[in-house]
């Protein structure tokens, strides 16, 4: 992918080259997007809309850290949807990881989570945030133990993993495909900024419906699909049950009972 590559920390120039090589990113001065490596982190900027600021992964401070400490633990909807209220801590494959917030929440509750992110720029941001979290004194130990990142298209990854004899199928496959957001729906400033940048960078997941079938084949216990409250079922397939929050819905496709049931 073509993108501007900017290094603001001269001593990290080689590191930026390695990031570009690993995620097959090519430098281009014509792109409106830039990956910027600073002293602190890797961030994405939309240069033609500087007021949007930088997008980066941060699990140590801010909203994600607050949710880990005060977010309701295993009583929150995502935990119930994944089956944590059954007395188990399932192995989860997050097949549309994005900035990793939901993966981090599940891992903070004890799950082992393997993340898949199909877009190379987002995956690079995710890897940078993961590495910084691993170095944190408070959360580094369990982040290192429970969270890993695989880079591939979600569709290909699910099929590749299903055919890999060395891969242990996850208990839960989690899907949160990007969905167009109506302008009349209220959004927080942060979500509005991220969605605006991501939808112009990545586009909507027009092939998201095709994720459900391979997810159902790969998961041992259930598939959980996060949807906006106004969105139809993924692939027009009715879930076994649904859990609703103020703005979202978790559609749960049950394959087998969780071991605690």
Swiss-Prot record:
Task: Name the major location.
Answer: cytoplasm
Query: Which residue windows are coiled coil?
Result: none
Q: Which domain of life is it from?
A: Bacteria
Q: Which UniProt keywords apply?
A: Cytoplasm, Methyltransferase, rRNA processing, S-adenosyl-L-methionine, Transferase
The entry sums up its family as follows: Belongs to the methyltransferase superfamily. RsmJ family.
**Gene3D superfamilies according to UniProt:** Vaccinia Virus protein VP39, YhiQ-like domain
Protein name as annotated: Ribosomal RNA small subunit methyltransferase J
* Gene Ontology biological-process entries: rRNA base methylation
Q: Write down the InterPro entries for this protein, in alphabetical order.
A: 16SrRNA_methylTrfase_J, SAM-dependent_MTases_sf
What is the organism field in this record?
Vibrio cholerae serotype O1 (strain ATCC 39315 / El Tor Inaba N16961)
The listed locations are: Cytoplasm
Its biological purpose: Specifically methylates the guanosine in position 1516 of 16S rRNA.
Please give the Gene Ontology molecular function terms for this protein.
16S rRNA (guanine(1516)-N(2))-methyltransferase activity
| CDD domains, per database record | AdoMet_MTases (cd02440)
Task: Give the catalysed reaction(s), semicolon-separated.
Answer: guanosine(1516) in 16S rRNA + S-adenosyl-L-methionine = N(2)-methylguanosine(1516) in 16S rRNA + S-adenosyl-L-homocysteine + H(+)
- Give the residues the record marks as binding S-adenosyl-L-methionine: 101-102, 117-118, 153-154, 176
Pfam short name (any one): SAM_MT
Q: Name one GO cellular component term.
A: cytoplasm
The gene coding this protein: rsmJ
Q: What EC identifiers does the entry list?
A: 2.1.1.242
